[in-house]
From Swiss-Prot:
Catalysis performed (reactions): propanoyl-CoA + NADP(+) = acryloyl-CoA + NADPH + H(+)
Keyword Iron: no
Binding residues annotated for Zn(2+) 2, in chain numbering: 90, 93, 96, 104
Top-rank lineage group of the source organism: Archaea
TM region positions: none
Family, as annotated: Belongs to the zinc-containing alcohol dehydrogenase family.
pH effect on activity, per entry: Optimum pH is 6.0 at 65 degrees Celsius. Retains half maximum activity at pH 7.5 at 65 degrees Celsius.
Entry keyword set: Metal-binding, NADP, Oxidoreductase, Zinc
UniProt cross-references to SMART domains, sorted A to Z: PKS_ER
Name of the protein this chain belongs to: Acryloyl-coenzyme A reductase
Lineage of producing organism: Archaea, Thermoproteota, Thermoprotei, Sulfolobales, Sulfolobaceae
Annotated PROSITE patterns: ADH_ZINC (PS00059), QOR_ZETA_CRYSTAL (PS01162)
Cofactor: Zn(2+)
Length: 334
């Protein structure tokens, strides 16, 4: 089969012919229907993921159809449409037992210790699998593990959303931001989308209740109302304004961190005196994925796709990811 393989640290990637995977105990083989490109791929190629075992197939977001099942597989069968978590938990530890699989000490990451999904077929451990409800588009399902489900989890850990709560999303036109708007609205929020582009603002207005254009957005946000939740999909460049935007008792779900070398000098006074909470994210759990798939199936979250590329044209996909004019997510169809 064809696959995108990373041969070693900082050695880029290659399109190669590799043997078809075979299922072991507690594993299935899927036909990859869609995968997705991510900024994380670029960070992996730059050497920021020390757990990678080489050579390894790149890609950590997937939806596919089961073609083979190994021994001990229960609850899944050939023909099932599934997604995978970003990692394979052991399924037995205390964290797995309470539904926080992302905290599993023995988890293995796809596109890290395990082969990923930029391939015609993929091998997935049963502990990673989540069934996709009938009628859910592939383009929406593939976004759940690392985009919509991750956002949902961050909001859940930040205490959820009250009906009518005012939420601000930075990087609102990006692959994460445009979907963060939709997740927040699906949960009952009013949403402010922030962008630096007048052209992108026209598109964001189709999803957000309010749009602010510019890098200094906190004062404009305050004129709209009391922002009590920020979903920051950018990182260091927007974090200070995100803090300033929040009213007393507010929360930030911090998702963006495009450049790990950037350091932010945190002003503790903002956190203490405004009684703020900062929430990170470790990717979706099975329950988060199931809940988000349901919202997607119901049409409350609609995938916004900037483009779809083949394995042979994956270079074009990465050019699209780096293009600041794109809106939405870039997918791979093997």
């Amino acid at each position: 089969m064809k696959a995108i393989v990373v041969p070693g640290p900082k050695q880029g990637y290659k399109l190669e012919e590799v043997p078809d995977p075979k299922p072991g105990k507690d594993e299935v083989i899927i036909r990859v229907d869609r995968a997705a490109l991510c900024y994380r791929d670029l960070l992996q190629l730059q050497g920021y993921y020390p757990r990678m075992k080489y050579p390894v197939i790149l890609g950590h977001e997937v939806v596919g159809t089961i073609e083979e099942v190994g021994e001990n597989i229960k609850g899944f069968e050939v023909g099932d449409k599934v997604i995978s978590l970003l990692y394979a938990p052991d399924g037995t530890c205390e964290y797995c037992q309470i539904g926080e699989e992302a905290y599993c000490h023995h988890r293995l990451g796809y596109s890290e210790e395990l082969d990923g999904f930029f391939a015609e077929k993929a091998k997935i451990k049963v502990t990673s699998l989540v069934k996709v409800p009938k009628g859910t588009p592939d383009e929406g399902a593939v976004l759940v593990p690392c985009v919509t489900g991750m956002i949902y989890r961050g909001i859940r850990r930040a205490g959820g959303i009250r009906k009518g709560e005012l939420v601000l999303v930075t990087g609102a036109s990006g692959g994460v931001g445009i979907h963060a708007i939709q997740v927040a609205k699906a949960l009952g929020a009013k949403v402010i989308g922030v962008t630096t582009s007048e052209e992108k603002a026209k598109i964001i207005k189709q999803y957000a209740d309010y749009v602010i254009v510019g890098t200094k957005f906190s004062e404009e946000a305050k004129k709209i109302g009391d922002v009590t939740l920020v979903i920051d999909t950018v990182g260091t460049p927007t974090f200070d304004e995100s803090l300033k935007s929040l009213w007393m008792g507010g929360r930030i779900v911090q998702i963006g961190n495009v450049d790990p070398s950037q350091i932010y000098n945190l002003r503790l006074g903002y956190i203490i005196l405004k009684d703020l909470k900062i929430v990170g994210h470790a990717s979706a759990t099975k329950k988060d994925a199931e809940d988000t798939l349901k919202l997607t199936q119901e049409g409350k979250i609609k995938p916004v796709i900037a483009g779809t590329v083949s394995l042979e044209n994956i270079d074009e996909g990465y050019k699209m990811i780096k293009d600041k004019n794109k809106v939405g997510k870039v997918l791979v169809k093997p």
